[in-house]
Amino acid sequence: MLQPKRTKFRKQQKGRNRGQALRGSQIDFGEYGLKAIGRGRITARQIEAARRAMTRHIKRGGKIWIRIFPDKPITQKPLEVRQGKGKGGVEFWAANIQPGRVLYEMEGVPEGVARRAFELAAAKLPIKTVFVTRAIM
């Protein structure tokens, strides 16, 4: 599972997820990409589940790049605990995603295989995505 090795602070405030993706909106490494058109939060488990789905579909051919990293700690209080007594413990790590962000890239496989692999990956993710190629961008 992806998570930072160390952070300056253990917990973060919730924050707001507004605007378009300023960085990471171009295909930099591969030929094909999976681009977010919705906004939301993707957990480390979802990133890994999508990666596994793609890897299983393309078998041994091709290369995959993960362009997002879960660097935001999400805290949660235990069940049936009253409010107060401080912030809960870190439950999982997530990445804030804005529209326009490239989530995954792939090369070394035919376009049909890449398209199907990204469809399988998109089914594991909580936000709407679209298939993009380097030529279109």
Swiss-Prot record:
Q: Which SUPFAM superfamilies match?
A: Ribosomal protein L16p/L10e
A GO cellular component entry from the record: cytosolic large ribosomal subunit
List all membrane-crossing ranges.
none
By its UniProt entry, which InterPro entries does this protein fall under? Ribosomal_uL16, Ribosomal_uL16_bact-type, Ribosomal_uL16_CS, Ribosomal_uL16_dom, Ribosomal_uL16_sf
Q: Which CDD domains match?
A: Ribosomal_L16_L10e (cd01433)
- Gene Ontology biological process terms from the UniProt entry: translation
Is Cell membrane tagged as a keyword?
no
One short Pfam family name for this protein? Answer: Ribosomal_L16
A GO molecular function annotation here is: tRNA binding
Q: Which UniProt keywords apply?
A: Ribonucleoprotein, Ribosomal protein, RNA-binding, rRNA-binding, tRNA-binding
Question: Compositional bias (Basic residues) at which positions?
Answer: 1-17
Q: Where is this region: Disordered?
A: 1-21
Q: Which family does it belong to?
A: Belongs to the universal ribosomal protein uL16 family.
The UniProt subunit note reads as follows:
Part of the 50S ribosomal subunit.
Under PANTHER family, the record lists: 50S/60S RIBOSOMAL PROTEIN L16, LARGE RIBOSOMAL SUBUNIT PROTEIN UL16M
What job does the chain carry out? Binds 23S rRNA and is also seen to make contacts with the A and possibly P site tRNAs.
The name of this protein is Large ribosomal subunit protein uL16
Instruction: Give the species.
Output: Nitrosococcus oceani (strain ATCC 19707 / BCRC 17464 / JCM 30415 / NCIMB 11848 / C-107)
Q: What is the lineage of its organism?
A: Bacteria, Pseudomonadati, Pseudomonadota, Gammaproteobacteria, Chromatiales
Q: Which gene encodes it?
A: rplP
